[in-house]
A protein has these predicted regions:
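Redox-cofactor binding/interface segments in oxidoreductases and associated redox assembly factors
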Residues: 36, 78, 237-238
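Short phosphate-binding/catalytic loops that engage adenosine nucleotides
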Residues: 54, 153-154, 203
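Glycine-rich FAD pyrophosphate-binding loop
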Residues: 51-71
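Extreme N-terminal leader/targeting segments of oxidoreductases
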Residues: 1-33, 51
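Dinucleotide-binding Rossmann-like beta1-alpha1 core, especially the glycine-rich loop
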Residues: 79-162
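N-terminal Rossmann-like FAD-binding beta1-loop-alpha1 element of flavoenzymes
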Residues: 31-58
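Helical element adjacent to the flavin cofactor pocket in flavoenzyme catalytic cores
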Residues: 146-147, 171-233
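Central helical "cap/lid" subdomain
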Residues: 225-264
Length: 264
């Protein structure tokens, strides 16, 4: 059979969490701020807005957090896809460093946020291994890592093919680089923590509420949803990889990327 007996049609990260139930079904028809998307982006925005004293509603086409926020690999790194060399070639050394620094800042920020807000989500600085599929790729990884270490004081560990079994238990790759400060988190627990913070701050959350059309009305907005019309003074689009024709301008600028992990 193609599917294992333990296969289930929901994220394994959700195991052990209480089901959300029907407590997120109602909508508020008139709010200061409406947020479309209840993932990390939408909930973080709702927490700050609600704490500032404004009435905010978060809607989602599925259950809160049904998308990538509870189905990702849980890795937290400082990395961006292009290498340091490619960033410098396109943007120059100063801008390339600024882009890299944003990643460093984000990792420090989320650790402090989790600690300050007391979110139980198994945050851990476990390190991350970047494996090389060829000797050529290994040479590139090492060159970039040494440059990052020298220019930005980022800790790195070079692992040869001979030593990688100590890290991965396999000889498949051609060595790699360890970034020891990279972290991991239980993404579903982190999302649930954000959800609880948003509710505590006074935000309203409505799941299974699909946004179908956005109309601009003078200086405000009317959003037609599967549960009725919602009026708001300000609108936040927090749909990320699920961005659709609802917002064509944003859709043209977002590229969904698949990410896969193996649960063992």
């Amino acid at each position: 059979a193609m599917w294992a007996e333990s296969w289930q049609n929901q994220s394994y990260w959700l195991d052990g969490l209480e089901p959300l139930g029907n407590s997120f079904e109602k909508i508020t028809t008139n709010v200061d701020v409406l947020i479309i998307g209840s993932g990390y982006t939408g909930l973080h925005a709702s927490i700050q807005i609600a704490r500032a004293g404004r009435e905010v509603l978060v809607i989602d086409s599925g259950e809160p957090g049904y998308g990538c926020s509870t189905r990702n690999g849980g890795q937290i790194s400082t990395s961006v896809k292009p290498s340091q060399g490619k960033l410098e070639a396109k943007y120059g050394q100063d801008q390339a460093r600024a882009i890299r620094q944003e990643g460093e800042n984000a990792l420090e920020w989320i650790e402090e946020f989790i600690k300050t807000e007391k979110i139980d989500c198994s945050f851990k600085r476990c390190g991350r291994f970047h494996a090389a599929h060829s000797q050529e790729q290994f040479n590139i990884l090492v060159k970039d890592a040494q440059k990052l270490s020298k220019q930005e004081d980022i800790p790195v560990e070079i692992v040869s093919k001979q030593d990688q079994r100590k890290e991965l238990g396999t000889d498949l790759y051609n060595g790699g680089v360890i970034f020891p400060r990279h972290a991991s988190v239980d993404p579903a627990k982190y999302h649930r923590g954000l959800l609880n913070l948003a509710i505590k701050a006074g935000a309203k959350i409505a799941g299974n509420c699909h946004a179908e059309k956005i109309n601009k009305v003078l200086s405000a907005y009317e959003v037609l949803t599967s549960k009725g019309k919602i009026s708001c003074k300000q609108l936040v689009i927090a749909t990320n990889g699920y961005t659709s024709k609802l917002t064509p301008w944003l859709q043209r600028r977002v590229i969904p990327i698949g990410s896969y992990i193996i649960a063992t």
